Amino acid sequence: ADIEATVMAYNASHFDGAEPKGFKDFFDTDKFPGARSAWKYASSGILEAALLADGVKPEELYPLDVERALKKLDTIKEDIIWWETGSQSEQLLSSGEVSMALVWVSRGLSSADKGVKIDWTNWTSQTGFWIVPKGAKNKELAMKAINFFTEPVQQAEFTKYMPYGPSNKHAIDKVDGKYKGNLPTDHLDTRTLLNSEWWAENQARVDLRFQEWLLQ
């Protein structure tokens, strides 16, 4: 019912001059020193971010070249502090323990008052769906609930508590002003949509390879 995002966020206190832009800078610890952080989960978008930083065009990402992505990750492996919960990612950034992190946009925005900024040069997103299972006993009520959840007023209100982008375009003008210009729906032109079909077919294999790489 909304458009989620994994974005590059950074603690501005780490940068006196130029500030980082895009995944390429996330992987450039010479130009932008400091620890990095990302979700310890293969299908979080970290492999896509690595490939984009390595020069792969968004439209040419799939099928993912996993080994190339891991080779790119090797360049910053010693600098990465992996997060496993959203609150952990927010703490790492806001405390300044890491200079940059790939985080859920809601966590980045929650830390804005602590000097955390979001860069929209590159970001990734996954597709989510509301579904009613075949044979559901309360199909009509379920459909009414989905209709309610996706109405403009409800979507705009939900953004106050979870600042993702409303999927109903009629909700955009109703969003709280403090988030306008900094939601996924304001930056769809720079989004890379993860290929859910490819991941469904390959996740078990890639998860195993990613865990092997982490232990190396």
Predicted regions and their residues:
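Extracytoplasmic ligand-binding site segments that recognize negatively charged/polar headgroups
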Residues: 1-94
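Structured segments of extracytoplasmic/periplasmic soluble domains
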Residues: 29, 76-79, 92, 96, ...
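Periplasmic-binding protein-like
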Residues: 29-43, 66-75, 112-136, 149-172
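C-terminal capping/gating helix-and-loop segments adjacent to ligand/active sites or protein-protein/ligand interfaces
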Residues: 156-216
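A bilobed periplasmic-binding-protein/Venus flytrap-type ligand-binding module shared by bacterial periplasmic
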Residues: 7-14, 51-55, 127-139, 146, ...
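A ligand-binding cleft/hinge motif common to bilobed small-molecule-binding domains
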Residues: 94-95, 100-116
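Short, hydrophobic alpha-helical packing/hinge segments within bilobed ligand-binding/sensory domains
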Residues: 89-92, 108, 142, 155
